[in-house]
């Protein structure tokens, strides 16, 4: 829906002088917009605007934003001293944690996460898993970590043979469902191929015989009408080996 609030993880982190916690708070775009409007209203001494904006900030639970941002940073591995350090003092991996904290802080109806555990240690991964389990919006998550996916996801979207297939359940359930689907499709494909072969042999044998031409023609039409079952598609395994020194 066009009115959904979408949150995502920025891939770039500028080397800023501002404290880490202030950078994370910038992730709440609506809060920052209202703060800017409040500053302008204060400069104009516009009481009506100030009251209105305070009401909107109250709705956003703005008065707890510092503690919420600090809680996110602590969960992602920052200590109390580090959350006050400038963004530019952190390495690339830790800056990505700041970007992740930004995305989690921003109120959203749709949260997009692409390999969010890449720069996290085990404690941070466990914390993030618990946080995402209680997330109230719609989460679109890409990850190669099945142990991370299983407790969180309830649907799997699988791209296969240029088609998008939906499976209900966690990743382990998806593997079982897909294996069952492939086995069924393989069995149906083989059964149909046997039927096609049987019909084709009959056609080849009797199409030139006057006494059997009608039956052969009927089988030809049956072949033409038949909706072909595709063979089960299995991804080619990727393998390589190091060259001997």
Please provide the spans of the model-predicted regions.
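Intracellular alpha-helical coupling/juxtamembrane segments of multi-pass membrane proteins
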Residues: 178-202, 206-233
């Amino acid at each position: 829906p066009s009115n959904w609030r979408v949150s995502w993880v920025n891939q770039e982190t500028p080397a800023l002088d501002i404290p880490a916690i202030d950078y994370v708070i910038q992730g709440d775009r609506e809060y920052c917009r209202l703060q800017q409007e409040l500053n302008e209203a204060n400069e104009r001494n516009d009481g009506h605007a100030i009251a209105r904006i305070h009401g909107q900030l109250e709705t956003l639970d703005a008065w707890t934003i510092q503690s919420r941002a600090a809680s996110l940073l602590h969960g992602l591995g920052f200590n109390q001293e580090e959350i006050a350090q400038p963004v530019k003092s952190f390495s690339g991996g830790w800056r990505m944690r700041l970007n992740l904290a930004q995305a989690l802080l921003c109120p959203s109806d749709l949260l997009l996460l692409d390999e969010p555990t890449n720069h996290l240690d085990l404690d941070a991964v466990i914390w993030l898993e618990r946080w995402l389990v209680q997330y109230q919006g719609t989460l679109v998550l890409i990850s190669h970590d099945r142990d991370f996916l299983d407790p969180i996801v309830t649907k799997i979207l699988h791209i296969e043979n240029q088609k998008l297939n939906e499976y209900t359940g966690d990743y382990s359930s998806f593997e079982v469902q897909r294996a069952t689907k492939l086995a069924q499709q393989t069995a149906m494909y083989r059964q149909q191929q046997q039927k096609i072969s049987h019909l084709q042999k009959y056609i080849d044998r009797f199409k030139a015989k006057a006494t059997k031409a009608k039956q052969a023609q009927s089988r030809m039409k049956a072949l033409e009408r038949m909706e072909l079952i595709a063979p089960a598609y299995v991804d080619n395994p990727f393998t390589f080996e190091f060259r001997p020194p």
